[in-house]
C-alpha cells in the first residue's frame, strides 16, 4: 500500500498528548516519534486541542474527526491551526470545498455501499468490524475502487493485528488506537510498533535488516546505518538513536563516545524499503573529525553551529561577543543589511547582501535561544494556515515607499478569486476589491465579476449517483440507512412522517407561531393574486378557437435543507404556493435531528399547508426517494427547493432520467446579491445587505455597484463591512465570500443597470434616489428590493415574495419560484366545420412539405366527408 504519510498508519489518541496523563498504551514521547496522530474533536475539547496545536502543530501531524462539530467556522479554525486533514459529515463537504484535499468525508459501518461516499480527497470509514458478514464483500470492492487516500478505523476492541491485515488487503491506511499499542517486549494484549513496521517494510537482505538514513532536524544526512524490529522498538522506547550493528547487535549511538542522539521522528520511504531517523545530534555523528559521514555541515546549519559555539566561548570584547550582548547593535545591523539587500542590483550583490542579513538575523535568534530548527518549524506551521493577511506594507515602511493603504486593493488583479485562493488570501481587514469601470477593460471587468468556480460535476456525481441508485432499488431500507449514517438518527424505524402530524411535534413559543402566521398570510396573499381569473381563449380565425387553462401539478416535493438548522422560511416559500395552487399531494423532505425528529417549525408549516407527509431524509437520498417513490414515500411529479451542490446535482440527475418522470424548479448555485448604491445610500444599510448574503457560504458572491461615490463614501461602506462582519458568528465564512467579491465604480444609473443585467443577480437591491424609476431598467434579476427600507431579509422571510430564486446567472432564463411553478398549462383547440375549412389547406400543405402523409390525410378525409355531406 503506497502512501505519502511518513508511516503507513495513524495513531488514534483520545486526548492530545501532554493534556493529560497517559496511563495506557504509548507515551506522549513515543507518539511524537511516530508523528501522525488522529483525534476525535468534540465541542467541549475544541479549545484544548487548539491550545495543543498552537504549541505542537509541527511536532505532530494531526488528523481530526470533526463530525461532532456543527460550526463550519470551528472546522476552518482547526485547519488554520495546522490540521493536516479533517474528516467531516458528507453534508458539510460543500461548505468546505475551498480547502481541497484537506477535507474528506467520514462514514460509519462495514458495508461496501459506504465506499461510494469517497471523494477526490479520499474517505474515512469508521467503526469497521472485520468480523461482520459483509466484510468480505467490502474487501473485494475496496480493492476495485482504489480510493486514495483511504483511511479505516476499527470498532473498539478489534484484534489489531488482524485489522492491519484487513486494511492491507483493502489498500487502506489503518487508524490504530494508542491504547492498543506498545514498545515494550511481549506486553500482553498490546501490539508492538516494531511488529507493525516490520510487517510492511521490505528488506532485500538475508538478515532482514533495513537501511536507515539518519538526518538532523534540517534533513541534512548524517550517515547510513541499519535497523531491525528490535532496534526500532528500543529507539522508540528510549527516544534515542538505537540501531542494529551487523556485527555487535544493538548499537546505542553515543553510549561510549558521548555523541548521543535524541530521537525526533521515524518514517519510511515511499517504497517501504528504507527508514529515516530524524535526530537531535549532540556532538559528531561520524567517527572522523567531521559532523557527519558525508562531510561537514554547510550553509545556515554550519553558521548556526558556529554562532552557538561563539556564544558559549567568544573572547570578551570581540565583535561576536558585542553582537550577543548589544541588542541595539544587532538591530542596527539587521536594518542596515535589509536596506542594502533592497538596493542590491545584480544576482551576485543580492546573494552577498542576503547572506549578511541572514548572518545578523540568525545571530539575533541564537542570542535569544532560538534555533534554526525553531525558525524552520515556524515556516512549516505558517504553510498550513488558511487565514492569511494580504501582506501589504504598513506604517513608516509603506510611507517611505509611497504606498497608500488602499493601493493594494486598487491594484488587485482582475482575475476572479477562486475558493482555493480564498483560503490563501484572507486579509486582516475584511474588504472587497475595487474596480473603476472607466479605468479597466471590459474583459478585465468581466473576469472580476466571474462567479466562483464550483466543484466539478463529475466529482459530485461520483458521490450522488450510487446513493440515488441504491434508493431506487432498495426503497425505504436505503433511505433509512442513509438517515442513520448521515444524520445519526439511528432510532428511526420509518423514513417518513405521515399526516396528521402529532401536536407534540409542533410545540412552539407563541412569538414564533405569530411570526410564521404573519409570513404565511403575506405569502398566501401574494401568490393567490397570481392566479388566473379564467382560461385564456382566442378565436384565431372564424371557427378556430384556441384556449389555455391551468391545472395544479398533482404531487409536488418540497426540499427543505436543515437537520440542526431551522428553516421554516423555505418550508413556507414552497408549501404555501403549492397549497394555493391546489396541489393534491404536498410532500416535504428535510433531514431530521439526531433524535429522529424534525424541527417543530417545519412540522407546524407542513400542518398549515396541508402537507401529506414529511420525508425524514436530506441530500441525494431524499431527492431520489421523492423522484422514484418507495414503499412508504409518495412519488412526486416535481421537486422544488434549494440545497447544496449534492442536492442540486441529484435534482438535475433525476430530472434527466425518463424512468423518474419528474421535473425540477431550476438549476441552483451559491447565494448572491448585487447592491446598487448612490450618494443617498446609508453605508451601514449597504454593508448589512452585502453581509446578509456573504454569510451563506464561502462560495457566495456579493457585488456593490457604486454610482459616482467619492473616496469618503466608499471608505465608509468598507469600514461598515469590516465592523459588522467581525461581529458576526460566521465571520470566517464571510471572509471567504468577500475574497471573491468586488466593488465596481460607475458614473450613472444607466451604466450600473447595464452591468447588473449582464450579471443577472439572484437578489438585486436598489439603494438609490428614485429607486422605483430604476425598476423599468431591470431586465435580469431573481428578485428586486427597492429603496432604503427594503432589505433583502424581508424577501427571505415575510414580505410575501418567494425566496427560492435563480442563481449563478440563470436569472437570464429562469424565474424564481411562483404560483406557476406548481401548475402546468394545458392548451386546447376547438374547431367547427367552418374552422377546419378555413385552416385545412394550410395544414395539409405544411404536412406535405414535411412529408407526413398521415397528418395531411387526417385533414383531407374530414374535408372530403364535408363535401360528400353537402
From Swiss-Prot:
Keywords: Amino-acid biosynthesis, ATP-binding, Histidine biosynthesis, Hydrolase, Metal-binding, Multifunctional enzyme, NAD, Nucleotide-binding, Oxidoreductase, Zinc. Zn(2+) binds at residues 693, 696, 796, 855. The keyword Zinc applies. This is Histidine biosynthesis trifunctional protein. Residues 1-285 are annotated as: Phosphoribosyl-AMP cyclohydrolase. In the C-terminal section; belongs to the histidinol dehydrogenase family. It catalyses: 1-(5-phospho-beta-D-ribosyl)-5'-AMP + H2O = 1-(5-phospho-beta-D-ribosyl)-5-[(5-phospho-beta-D-ribosylamino)methylideneamino]imidazole-4-carboxamide; 1-(5-phospho-beta-D-ribosyl)-ATP + H2O = 1-(5-phospho-beta-D-ribosyl)-5'-AMP + diphosphate + H(+); L-histidinol + 2 NAD(+) + H2O = L-histidine + 2 NADH + 3 H(+). It comes from Neurospora crassa (strain ATCC 24698 / 74-OR23-1A / CBS 708.71 / DSM 1257 / FGSC 987). The gene is his-3. Gene3D superfamilies: 1.20.5.1300, MazG-like (1.10.287.1080), Nitrogenase molybdenum iron protein domain (3.40.50.1980), Phosphoribosyl-AMP cyclohydrolase (3.10.20.810). Changing residue 726 to M: In strain: FGSC 541. Its EC number is 3.5.4.19, 3.6.1.31, 1.1.1.23. Its cofactor is Zn(2+). Residues 286-367 are annotated as: Phosphoribosyl-ATP pyrophosphohydrolase. Changing residue 50 to V: In strain: FGSC 541. The active site is at residues 762-763.
Amino acid at each position: 500500500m503506497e502512501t505519502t504519510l511518513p508511516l503507513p498508519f495513524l495513531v488514534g489518541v483520545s486526548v492530545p498528548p501532554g493534556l493529560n496523563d497517559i496511563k495506557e498504551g504509548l507515551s506522549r514521547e513515543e507518539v511524537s516519534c511516530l508523528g501522525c496522530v488522529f483525534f476525535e474533536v468534540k465541542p467541549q475539547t475544541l479549545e484544548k486541542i487548539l491550545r495543543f496545536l498552537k504549541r505542537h502543530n509541527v511536532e505532530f501531524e494531526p488528523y481530526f474527526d470533526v463530525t461532532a462539530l456543527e460550526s463550519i467556522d470551528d472546522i476552518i479554525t482547526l485547519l488554520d491551526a495546522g490540521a493536516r486533514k479533517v474528516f467531516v459529515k458528507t453534508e458539510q463537504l460543500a461548505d468546505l470545498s475551498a480547502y481541497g484535499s484537506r477535507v474528506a468525508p467520514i462514514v460509519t459501518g462495514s458495508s461496501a455501499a459506504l465506499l461510494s461516499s469517497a471523494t477526490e480527497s479520499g474517505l474515512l470509514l469508521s467503526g469497521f468490524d472485520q468480523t461482520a458478514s459483509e466484510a468480505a464483500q467490502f474487501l473485494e470492492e475496496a480493492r476495485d475502487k482504489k480510493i486514495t487516500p483511504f483511511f479505516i478505523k476499527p470498532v473498539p476492541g478489534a484484534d489489531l493485528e488482524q485489522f492491519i491485515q484487513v486494511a492491507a488487503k483493502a489498500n487502506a491506511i489503518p487508524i490504530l488506537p494508542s491504547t492498543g499499542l506498545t514498545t515494550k517486549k511481549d506486553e500482553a494484549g498490546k501490539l508492538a510498533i516494531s511488529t507493525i513496521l516490520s510487517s510492511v517494510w521490505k528488506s532485500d537482505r538475508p538478515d532482514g535488516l533495513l537501511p536507515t538514513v539518519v538526518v538532523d532536524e534540517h534533513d541534512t544526512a548524517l550517515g547510513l546505518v541499519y535497523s531491525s524490529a528490535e532496534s526500532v522498538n528500543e529507539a522508540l522506547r528510549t527516544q534515542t538513536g538505537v540501531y542494529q550493528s551487523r556485527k555487535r547487535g544493538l548499537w546505542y549511538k553515543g553510549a561510549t563516545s558521548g555523541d548521543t542522539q535524541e530521537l525526533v521522528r521515524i518514517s519510511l520511504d515511499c517504497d517501504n524499503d528504507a527508514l529515516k531517523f530524524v535526530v537531535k545530534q549532540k556532538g559528531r555523528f561520524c567517527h572522523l573529525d567531521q559532523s557527519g559521514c558525508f562531510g561537514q555541515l554547510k550553509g545556515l546549519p554550519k553558521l548556526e553551529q558556529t554562532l552557538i559555539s561563539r556564544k558559549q566561548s567568544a573572547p570578551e570584547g570581540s565583535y561576536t561577543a558585542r553582537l550577543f550582548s548589544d541588542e541595539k547593535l544587532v538591530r542596527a545591523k539587521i536594518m542596515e543589511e535589509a536596506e542594502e539587500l533592497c538596493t542590491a542590483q545584480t544576482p551576485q550583490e543580492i546573494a552577498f547582501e542576503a547572506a549578511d542579513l541572514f548572518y545578523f538575523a540568525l545571530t539575533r535568534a541564537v542570542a535569544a535561544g532560538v534555533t534554526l530548527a525553531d525558525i524552520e518549524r515556524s515556516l512549516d506551521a505558517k504553510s498550513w494556515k488558511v487565514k492569511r493577511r494580504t501582506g501589504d506594507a504598513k506604517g513608516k515602511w509603506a510611507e517611505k515607499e509611497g504606498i497608500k493603504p488602499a493601493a493594494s486593493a486598487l491594484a488587485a488583479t482582475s482575475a476572479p478569486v477562486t475558493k482555493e485562493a480564498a483560503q490563501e488570501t484572507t486579509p486582516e481587514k475584511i474588504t472587497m476589491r475595487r474596480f473603476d469601470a472607466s479605468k479597466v477593460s471590459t474583459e478585465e471587468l468581466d473576469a472580476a465579476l466571474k462567479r466562483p468556480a464550483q466543484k466539478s460535476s463529475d466529482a459530485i456525481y461520483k458521490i450522488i449517483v450510487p446513493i440515488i441508485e441504491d434508493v431506487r432499488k432498495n426503497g425505504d431500507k436505503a433511505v433509512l440507512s442513509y438517515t442513520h449514517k448521515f444524520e445519526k438518527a439511528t432510532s428511526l424505524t420509518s423514513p417518513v412522517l405521515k399526516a396528521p402530524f402529532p401536536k407534540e411535534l409542533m410545540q412552539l413559543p407563541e412569538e414564533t407561531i405569530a411570526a410564521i402566521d404573519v409570513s404565511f398570510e403575506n405569502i398566501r396573499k401574494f401568490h393567490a393574486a397570481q392566479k388566473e381569473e379564467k382560461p385564456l381563449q382566442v378565436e384565431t380565425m372564424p371557427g378556430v378557437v384556441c384556449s389555455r387553462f391551468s391545472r395544479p401539478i398533482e404531487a409536488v416535493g418540497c426540499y427543505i435543507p436543515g437537520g440542526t438548522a431551522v428553516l421554516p422560511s423555505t418550508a413556507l416559500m414552497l408549501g404555501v404556493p403549492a397549497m394555493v395552487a391546489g396541489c393534491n399531494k404536498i410532500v416535504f423532505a428535510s433531514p431530521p435531528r439526531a433524535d429522529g425528529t424534525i424541527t417543530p417549525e417545519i412540522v407546524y408549516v407542513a400542518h398549515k399547508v396541508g402537507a401529506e407527509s414529511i420525508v425524514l431524509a436530506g441530500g441525494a437520498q431524499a431527492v431520489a426517494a421523492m423522484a422514484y417513490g418507495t414503499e412508504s414515500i409518495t412519488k412526486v411529479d416535481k421537486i422544488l427547493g434549494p440545497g447544496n451542490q449534492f442536492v442540486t446535482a441529484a435534482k438535475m440527475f433525476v430530472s434527466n432520467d425518463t424512468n423518474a418522470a419528474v421535473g425540477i424548479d431550476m438549476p441552483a448555485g451559491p447565494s448572491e446579491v448585487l447592491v446598487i448604491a448612490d450618494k443617498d445610500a446609508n453605508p451601514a444599510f449597504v454593508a448589512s445587505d452585502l453581509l446578509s448574503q456573504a454569510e451563506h457560504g464561502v462560495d457566495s458572491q456579493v457585488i456593490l455597484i457604486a454610482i459616482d461615490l467619492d473616496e469618503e463614501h466608499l471608505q465608509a461602506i468598507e469600514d461598515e463591512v469590516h465592523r459588522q462582519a467581525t461581529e458576526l458568528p460566521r465571520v470566517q465564512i464571510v471572509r471567504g465570500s468577500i475574497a471573491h467579491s468586488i466593488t465596481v465604480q460607475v458614473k450613472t444609473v444607466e451604466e450600473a443597470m447595464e452591468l447588473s443585467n449582464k450579471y443577472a443577480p439572484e437578489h438585486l437591491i436598489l439603494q438609490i434616489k428614485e429607486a422605483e424609476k430604476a425598476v423599468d431598467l431591470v431586465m435580469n434579476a431573481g428578485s428586486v428590493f427597492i429603496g432604503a427600507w427594503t432589505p433583502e431579509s424581508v424577501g427571505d422571510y415575510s414580505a410575501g415574495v418567494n425566496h427560492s430564486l435563480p442563481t449563478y446567472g440563470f436569472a437570464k432564463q429562469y424565474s424564481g419560484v411562483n404560483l406557476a411553478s406548481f401548475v402546468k398549462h394545458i392548451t386546447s383547440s376547438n374547431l367547427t366545420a367552418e374552422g377546419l375549412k378555413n385552416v385545412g389547406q394550410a395544414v395539409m400543405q405544411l404536412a406535405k412539405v414535411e412529408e407526413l402523409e398521415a397528418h395531411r390525410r387526417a385533414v383531407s378525409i374530414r374535408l372530403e366527408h364535408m363535401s360528400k355531406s353537402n
